[in-house]
């Protein structure tokens, strides 16, 4: 909204309360936390499968990333093991801000090919997984994340799907 103020919309179509009314806002924490777990797990999947990301989707119990990947990896079980190992390390997840100029000077931070971070609208939020001096993941992201990778819990990978020329889809599910 105006000046960056949040915009709240009713869950169901209904008239808005009169200006100045006292209202109660609730957050479905269980749903949000599941989304946070899946989202953070997808960050770690992009570490284990270190290929450019061309798409993705986050759901409550599952998510997916589409990778620019000409040939499929041979051992999906090894990828799942590596992913669950990273989750089990209990890595801290933190955020910090950089300028658009700093991001432009570090293009390797952007893992997505088509969904570029918004620039020209102020600072860019970075999400970091791991130690400040040696993060295992650092990329622009405006989403919600867990505070520690152990919050994710174990995950299972689905089958790798061929989604067209040089695009492979990897899905994951919360176990």
Model regions: which residues?
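Active-/binding-site microenvironments in catalytic and ligand-binding cores
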Residues: 1-175
């Amino acid at each position: 909204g105006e000046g960056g103020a949040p915009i709240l919309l009713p869950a169901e179509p209904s008239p808005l309360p009169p200006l100045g009314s006292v209202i109660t806002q609730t957050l479905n924490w269980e749903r949000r936390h599941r989304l946070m777990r899946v989202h953070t797990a997808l960050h770690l999947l992009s570490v284990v499968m270190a290929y450019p990301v061309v798409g993705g989707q986050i759901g409550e119990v599952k998510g997916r990333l589409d990778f620019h990947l000409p040939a499929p990896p041979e051992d999906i079980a090894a990828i799942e093991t590596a992913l669950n190992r990273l989750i089990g390390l209990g890595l801290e997840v933190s955020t910090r801000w950089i300028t658009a100029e700093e991001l432009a000077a570090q293009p390797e931070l952007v893992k997505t090919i088509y969904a570029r971070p918004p620039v020209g609208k102020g600072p860019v939020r970075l999400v970091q997984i791991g130690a400040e001096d040696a993060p295992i993941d650092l990329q622009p992201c405006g989403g919600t994340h867990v505070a520690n990778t152990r919050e994710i819990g174990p995950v299972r990978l689905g089958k790798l799907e061929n989604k067209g020329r040089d695009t492979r889809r990897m899905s994951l599910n919360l176990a």
